[in-house]
Regions:
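Active-site neighborhoods and metal-handling regions in enzymes and metal-associated proteins
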Residues: 1-432
Length: 432
């Protein structure tokens, strides 16, 4: 394993917090993700079901976790099932978790091979007084699930085998729990941000006119993997010039031109936790006056947004306050005038022409992490703060983004060590 996993105490605590939310006489079950195919016999890199990972720390395919907190025999209140390894598997695929390793990793005492699952599952359902079965689905508000998952196949099988049980949704419970980060999770997120910092500093000494966007992408991935990350937390955006005005530009195939500003929206993954950073740098090493004016405007909005982001705030009200900060800056930049402000509507705010996306999102095991955007922001949540100004007619896009932990009396900025001031970025680029 290239990353240091969180201690078992985290997963023990997470399971306890979940079981406290279950109804009496319940069973909850979580499957690992499938290994997804590409073409022929090719497969994508395995990525674990984050709910299973959150509850067990097990980062391996063909795994199942059962929680049955009211079962009479304490041995079976928590059971973890693993794929049984063999000499052939070890030769062809490498090491798989032993039962003892899984116990140490997860804190689950009863670890069995997957072949034992059918018999024990039936025993729990028949003899455990189980009334409710909590099953796992992807209910993220942005999800568009078109591929049948391992969890979906199990739901279909389970409901056919046990049609008279009551079925409950595990996803809302996990979303509520995962939205508030534990100290061990914040440590992993900080590590992802620290790796991102190292890579960004490397890139500052590399960017020059004529460099291809994908060459910059290569510099990031080199440093990420060198530092123990498995790579990018999401598809990177390396957008020079007019490309920065395309919010999800991912081709990364153009040359950086003299005088352009380069937008970098990248983050490292570490231990399945994710960083999400955006910085903008001058390709030639110095911002023009206009570029710096726009940069400073975005930076002021970012800092103003951080002051507004606090426990008890509601995201959509917070975002509207940030839009008002942006109005002031767009006026100063002469991108809008007072007539534009007077004629705007709630449905079509004047800032939307130049700032058309949200101010932030939950961050954690998922880049756009689970959590209800309509619920109040609470202490322990991790959010991105990412205002931007996109001036297509000037081929200029500036977005700045940091990751912050919501505290009782202020924010913990996980990216405080990543260069942000325009002058610091210029100095680092010209010190090479």
């Amino acid at each position: 394993m290239r990353y240091s996993p969180a201690p078992a105490a985290l997963y023990i605590r997470n399971r306890k917090r979940l079981t406290q939310k279950l109804k009496s006489n319940s069973l909850a079950l979580f499957n690992s993700n499938d290994i997804m195919p590409t073409n022929a016999d090719g497969t994508m890199a395995f990525r674990q079901n984050n709910n299973l990972l959150y509850l067990s720390g097990v980062d391996q395919e063909e795994s199942i976790l059962i929680l049955c907190p009211d079962f009479p025999d304490k041995r079976y209140r928590e059971v973890l099932f693993l794929r049984e390894t063999s000499e052939q598997i070890a030769i062809w695929e490498g090491h798989k978790l032993t039962r003892e390793e899984a116990r140490h990793l997860s804190g689950v005492e009863t670890v069995l091979w997957l072949s034992e699952f059918p018999k024990l599952f039936h025993h729990l359902m028949a003899m455990g007084g189980v009334l409710q079965v909590y099953l796992d689905t992807n209910e993220h508000y942005r999800a568009d699930v078109v591929v049948e998952t391992r969890n979906a196949r199990f739901i279909d099988w389970c409901q056919k085998q046990y049609p008279l049980h009551t079925y409950e949704r595990a996803a809302p419970l996990l979303a509520e729990l995962r939205a508030v980060k534990q100290p061990e999770e914040i440590k992993q997120l900080q590590k992802a941000c620290d790796i991102t910092n190292l890579a960004f500093r490397r890139v500052l000494s590399f960017v020059n006119p004529g460099v291809k966007e994908y060459e910059i992408e290569a510099e990031f991935i080199h440093e990420f993997i060198r530092q123990g990350s498995r790579g990018f937390a999401y598809t990177p955006i390396i957008a020079s010039g007019a490309n920065a005005c395309v919010l999800h530009y991912i081709e990364n195939d153009q040359a950086c031109k003299p005088g352009d500003v380069l937008l970098l929206d990248v983050g490292a993954e570490y231990g399945n936790y994710n960083a999400d950073m955006t910085r903008c740098v001058p390709v030639s090493g110095r911002f023009t006056k206009r570029q710096k004016d726009v940069y400073q405007a975005v930076l002021r909005v970012m800092r103003g947004a951080m002051k507004l982001l606090r426990p008890g705030a509601l995201y959509f009200e917070y975002h509207r306050e940030v839009q008002r900060l942006m109005e002031t800056e767009l006026l100063k930049l002469k991108l809008i005038d007072k007539t534009d402000i007077k004629n705007q509507t709630k449905e079509k705010p004047v800032v939307a022409k130049y700032f058309m996306h949200g101010t932030g999102h939950h961050l954690g095991l998922d880049v756009h992490d689970v959590g209800n955007m309509y619920h109040k922001i609470v202490e322990g949540m991790v959010w991105t703060v990412e205002p931007g100004i996109y001036i297509r007619e000037e081929k200029l896009g500036i977005r700045l983004e940091n990751n912050v932990v919501i505290g009782k009396s202020g924010l913990l900025d996980l990216m405080k060590n990543i260069p942000l001031e325009a002058e610091e970025i210029e100095d680092l680029m010209n010190a090479r």
